[in-house]
Amino acid sequence: MSDIYNAPHLQRHNYKTDMSEQEKLFAKLNAKTDAESKRLQRYIAMADLSKQDGSPVKLITEKVLNLPTLKNLDIIETPEVITPELVFDLFNFPKDHPARSASDSYFLDANHVLRPHTSLMWKYYLDIPEIKKRLEENGSIGVLSFGKCYRRDEIDWQHSNILHQIDGFFVIRKDIKTLDQKDLENILVEVCEALYGKDVKYKFVVDHFPYTDPSVEMNIEMNGQMVEILGAGIAHPNVLKNLGIDPEKYNAWAFGFGSDRLAMIKQNIPDIRLLYSQDERVTKQLADLEHKFVPVSKYPPITRDISFIVDKSFDLNAYYELIREIAGSEMTEEVKLLDKYKNEAKFGKDKISYTFRTIYRSLDRTLTSEEVDTKHKKLEEVTIQKFGAVVR
């Protein structure tokens, strides 16, 4: 790997952004009693596994932060609540990008959103006066950030609305090094080989992100299935310019690893909910990063379907959120969209029929048909009330 990451001036410093505004916003949120505020309070109160002793997410994070190529990069801790202008406008998101909507992101109010990723640390890092001075004097800087993120998402073994990321950002003057995608891919491969060995099977897939161009995602094989573990790319010139960096003079790479998935692949963990388990049979296994997870006795699933007709504006992520609220993440293993179709003659204009299958299964006990039926009946009722659905 190039010596640009071990230049003498690159010596790790730790920074923490002022959190006083976040504390005020959380206090204001905690005083509210409406359903949405209560939901956000629960999500915010969930443990940040990247900082929790005994969690494989923390162990993976520490391992990545201290790899030879990354060990000299600074570390910065940033707020979990930011403004839409920071996370979207500065990072080149189009005005109609779905991430800007409440169907994809969690808004505390019109002016504050729970961070959907930790890449926003670019802004906080470059706002530190000494950082730009170091860049001007030495020609390169680099930083890592990690922590909890919030994103409305589907429900299955590898997805959660609460996730953890490890982000990296490296800026260098072009006359020292013109970065290309291969430079970035070399680092990503180094990370994966350090975690999984030289025989790890991976592939890069072209992707598109507002703040990097070109962009790529990386997939790692887990039990014969390719699992996405990150998005990465060369920093978009518009974003560098927005952050006060001359893109004619400097270039940069960036990555964002999903540390939950890194841990799941490392230990062969079959369900993302296990990362939060309090079952001693689970926690003992997760505390050893080199241990391959051995499933504890698996409780039986209970499956229920729901079919309904709704307006074409129906929001899938909002529905997944509703299921989390009604059934609870601890009971909901997976939600599958089985069928979606239009039939104007049968359902009416601008109407769509959906069929979902919910697999109910607890990690620590056997569910009864009666309690699942109660939850599922409630789901039907709220689906009708909230979305104007006609249940079939």
Where are these regions (language model features)?
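Generic solvent-exposed, charged/amphipathic alpha-helical segments
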Residues: 61-69, 185-193, 320-324, 376-384
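Conserved short secondary-structure elements within globular domains
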Residues: 139-151, 197-202, 333-340
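Class II aminoacyl-tRNA synthetase-like tRNA-binding/catalytic domains
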Residues: 2-162, 171, 226, 231-240, ...
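An acidic, glycine-/histidine-flanked metal-binding catalytic module
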Residues: 165, 169-191, 195-196, 265-289, ...
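Positively charged, Gly/Ser-enriched RNA/tRNA-binding surfaces
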Residues: 59-71, 121, 132-134, 186-191, ...
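Beta-rich nucleic-acid/ligand-interaction surfaces
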Residues: 75-102, 198-223, 337-346
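A carboxyl-terminal module marker
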Residues: 210-223, 227-392
